[in-house]
């Protein structure tokens, strides 16, 4: 491809509204352009990368025995009413009516549509198991789209759905998808980690996420230092306390804390050890009888909202209570709350349950209790795992300790069970002629998100460093002052022709530009290999080659260059 015939819209300056590196570089490299909040057009370089990601995903899905279909982006609301998600899904589900006042949604996911297809098309156990997938645009009306295509409203996704009569074939397909996802990310040259995950709003039992490792990742991954255990921090089980509750050595008393609104201020101003403090958080309850619930973790621990949401007494999805609600119910603000005399249901983390002589808010503004002890000063509360794990703690697998990594989720696989098939009456006749509700699996890959994640993992201060498998072009040709030298022009044209004839994807910079601009653009867009042609090269019978990732430079004889680039990784 000649740059003169190509839309290479690079920018020198970093856009002010781009928060993360991938968003900045995708804009600067001319890969995408914003049309509206969370909506982007893909320009030629971006689309070339997107199509390469899509091709690898498609190949590995086909290799795993899945069959491609295509479902509509617009879905009838009736299907969502059947599963109950019409009411459960929040405002991220874009709803609209056609000219006949019929309700529709712009699909954020396709469980309802695929289940409707299967219940109409599959009637016998002989047609199972079946694994169908599509690569389709999705839309989720995110409250705050950000990070470019990392969290956009419209995005490209591969979603697959499998149907089974028994758990054995469900497990087999799940493992096949696990392997396929590992192959997909491995072929793209990305460092990644599969992790145990929460099933979230889609529901189901078994679930794994696939994370591209990057320091900028939003997700925290807990892993064992001595086994292959890895889990999203939302899912990782905190270890049980190894020491029993200590005996009381203090009497409970009230202290004035007018300027201590946070745990840190309480510790700093009053000399209390942070491990002797607790955080009391008020969340929305699941019942009218208990509209508010108190959940408590130790002062140096972080509340795990996903774990809290799984408590029967807590409203799902998780929602913090507002200050006005809290004051109306408890008589004090969030910085002065504690379990002593609490009139709403109380759940404490295992680590809080073994505390003694601890400090907490007194449910009066500007006052705290110190020397609190369970059973003496307040009744035993409900106990559960409510916190995030901490680096260095024993791993839940029993081997090694917990380490923490940051990752970007690009894939998620679920065993859904009968959540959707039961709601929609998707069943088949088994060998005995008896109707059996189908087991379902669900497997998603964020195709457009992988592009951004790859950049987050592969860049430097000059631009993108594409892994070869998904680079927009394999090699760039940079002829120095080609328009002033027939020798350079002729050699560049011949090299372009030879490489193209060999099936190599080439970007030939034939612009009338200064060499500095050409070099900067080539490094910004991140092609793995660059060939420079100047007068000295022609005199010496060699091309100057540069590897984008390593920065290594070599002189390659004219006659060897095609084979060299073909074999370059």
UniProtKB/Swiss-Prot annotation:
What Gene Ontology terms describe where this protein resides (cellular component)?
Answer: cytosol
Q: Which Pfam families match?
A: HGTP_anticodon, tRNA-synt_2b, tRNA_edit
Query: GO BP, one example?
Result: prolyl-tRNA aminoacylation
Q: What is its EC number?
A: 6.1.1.15
One GO molecular function term?
ATP binding
Q: Which UniProt keywords apply?
A: Aminoacyl-tRNA synthetase, ATP-binding, Cytoplasm, Ligase, Nucleotide-binding, Protein biosynthesis
The catalytic activity, as recorded, is: tRNA(Pro) + L-proline + ATP = L-prolyl-tRNA(Pro) + AMP + diphosphate
Compartments where found: Cytoplasm
What InterPro entries has UniProt attached to this entry?
aa-tRNA-synt_IIb, aa-tRNA-synth_II, aa-tRNA-synth_II/BPL/LPL, Anticodon-bd, Anticodon-bd_dom_sf, Pro-tRNA-ligase_IIa, Pro-tRNA-synth_IIa_bac-type, Pro-tRNA-Synthase_IIa_type1
According to its UniProt entry, the function of this protein is described as: Catalyzes the attachment of proline to tRNA(Pro) in a two-step reaction: proline is first activated by ATP to form Pro-AMP and then transferred to the acceptor end of tRNA(Pro). As ProRS can inadvertently accommodate and process non-cognate amino acids such as alanine and cysteine, to avoid such errors it has two additional distinct editing activities against alanine. One activity is designated as 'pretransfer' editing and involves the tRNA(Pro)-independent hydrolysis of activated Ala-AMP.
Question: What PANTHER family does this protein's entry cite?
Answer: MITOCHONDRIAL RIBOSOME PROTEIN L39/PROLYL-TRNA LIGASE FAMILY MEMBER, PROLINE--TRNA LIGASE
Query: Quaternary structure?
Result: Homodimer.
Instruction: Report the sequence similarity comment from the record.
Output: Belongs to the class-II aminoacyl-tRNA synthetase family. ProS type 1 subfamily.
Relay the domain remarks: Consists of three domains: the N-terminal catalytic domain, the editing domain and the C-terminal anticodon-binding domain.
**This protein is called what?**
Proline--tRNA ligase
Organism annotation: Shewanella loihica (strain ATCC BAA-1088 / PV-4)
